[in-house]
């Protein structure tokens, strides 16, 4: 506030001096008008900035629940340090199941999150996926698909492609929506028996995503999402995520099962966590996707 007040004062002061001199020297009338117009524009801009900051501070003050939710959600992600194994299963409308072994590890470093997933198909083929998310929520994805000896950057236009034929996409593997610029607290709702905050997250111009918005139903007691709806850009259908088996280990809440459903499409996909550790003490060397692929080649 002080900086803006000083800026406004410095904007008006030269205008006052010039106007006083213009009265004494009439031949500078045109210069006086130009300076007055320029000064008016500057002061108007400064006033608009001031009003916008006041409005923003009032909005934050009026939504302490919003600030608490965002802080807790981000802190939960910033404390990640786990290894886990489980199954990723696509369930067709007729009940037919296709299951994949799912192995993942994640750790938050000083420059952000790293998540490495290894998905084994019904045969011996494996897909590797390395996601990086910066401290501001910017995402980068590398993949190594069956038959590829080296990993490569996944083009943005493929981020929302199905992951090994399931309803999960590549970008669904991280919760970057909590780091997006635009966050709105909607009216509270019940989801089943749970009282929930409802948070609507929208990406800013700098956020790379195929989603137009993500709406999260967050349990008021544990501040963990129990239901999420992602709206794709354009005319694409919505995608729904349901979290089951919520548990607290070492003070950290997590889900043991996540189900993904695509609106208008029969069946669903289920990610089940079967075992793991929430304190894996991982380092950067544990997220070398090229090293993983080299080890796989040696093991054949």
Q: How should these model regions be labeled?
A:
Residues 1-37:
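N-terminal secretory signal peptides that target proteins for export/translocation
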Residues 287-299:
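Short, low-complexity, Pro/Ser/Thr/Gly-rich segments in the mature regions of secreted, periplasmic
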Residues 59-62:
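Boundary at the C-terminal end of the N-terminal hydrophobic targeting segment
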Residues 64-147, 184:
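N-terminal mature ectodomain segment of secretory-pathway/periplasmic proteins
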Residues 177-181:
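Surface-exposed beta-loop interaction hotspot
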Residues 42-54:
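Bacterial N-terminal signal peptides
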Residues 150-152, 161-163, 168-176, 190-290:
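Gly/Pro-enriched, hydrophobic low-complexity segments
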Residues 105-107, 184-190, 244-246:
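Short amphipathic beta-strand and strand-loop transition segments with alternating hydrophobic
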């Amino acid at each position: 506030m002080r900086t803006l007040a000083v800026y406004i004062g410095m904007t008006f002061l030269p205008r006052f001096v010039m106007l006083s001199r213009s009265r004494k020297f009439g031949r500078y009338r045109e210069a006086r008008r130009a300076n007055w117009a320029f000064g008016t524009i500057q002061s108007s801009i400064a006033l608009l900035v001031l009003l916008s900051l006041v409005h923003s501070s009032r909005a934050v003050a009026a939504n302490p629940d919003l600030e608490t939710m965002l802080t807790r959600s981000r802190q939960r992600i910033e404390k990640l340090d786990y290894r886990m194994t489980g199954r990723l299963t696509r369930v067709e409308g007729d009940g037919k199941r296709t299951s994949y072994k799912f192995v993942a590890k994640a750790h938050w470093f000083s420059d952000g999150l790293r998540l490495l997933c290894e998905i084994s198909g019904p045969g011996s083929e494996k897909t590797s996926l390395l996601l990086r998310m910066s401290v501001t929520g910017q995402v980068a994805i590398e993949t190594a698909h069956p038959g590829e000896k080296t990993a490569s950057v996944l083009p943005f236009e493929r981020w929302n492609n199905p992951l090994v034929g399931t309803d999960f996409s590549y970008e669904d593997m991280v919760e970057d929506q909590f780091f997006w610029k635009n966050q709105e607290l909607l009216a509270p709702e019940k989801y089943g028996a749970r009282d929930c905050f409802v948070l609507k997250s929208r990406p800013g111009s700098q956020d790379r995503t195929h989603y137009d918005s993500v709406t999260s139903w967050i349990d008021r007691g544990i501040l963990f999402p129990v239901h999420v709806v992602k709206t794709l850009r354009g005319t694409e259908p919505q995608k729904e995520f349901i979290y089951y088996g919520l548990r607290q280990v070492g003070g950290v809440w997590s889900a043991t099962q996540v189900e993904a459903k695509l609106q208008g499409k029969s069946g669903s996909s289920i990610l089940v966590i079967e075992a793991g550790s929430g304190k894996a003490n991982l380092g950067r060397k544990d997220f070398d996707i090229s090293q993983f692929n080299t080890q796989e080649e040696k093991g054949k």
